[in-house]
Design a protein with these regions (language model features):
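Short, polar/acidic, helix-capping and beta-turn segments at strand->helix junctions
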Residues: 1-101
């Protein structure tokens, strides 16, 4: 199944992709690799999910925020390259969560 078909089947709704700002570029292509810059947890209305998991956010809210980061990254790829089906595989993901120890 193509990536675009999976997205359609899951009924995913994407938040707006971040725009380039100053030296920040949401994506960069080097050779045949697409590098996706750091993204924050954006709601579908474009506002930012704020708070620290364990104090301001509970576990489920933290999980939802992490999901939004992934959706925002997919939104960036789709908005910048139009076709998610060209992505063959993910090589590396660096994920960070603002959480209490």
């Amino acid at each position: 199944m193509k990536n675009s078909e999976t997205i359609k089947k899951l009924g995913l709704v994407f938040p707006p992709a971040p725009k380039p700002l100053g030296v920040y570029l949401p994506t960069l292509v080097v050779d045949r690799f697409l590098y996706v810059s750091g993204h924050g947890p954006l709601k579908n209305d474009g506002s930012l999910i704020k708070g620290k998991v364990g104090s301001e956010l509970d576990r489920e809210e933290g999980k939802a925020a992490a999901r939004q980061v992934g959706l925002t990254m997919l939104s960036t790829i789709i908005n910048n390259y139009g076709n998610i089906d060209n992505i063959k595989r993910v090589v590396k993901v660096l994920g960070m969560v603002n959480a209490t120890p």
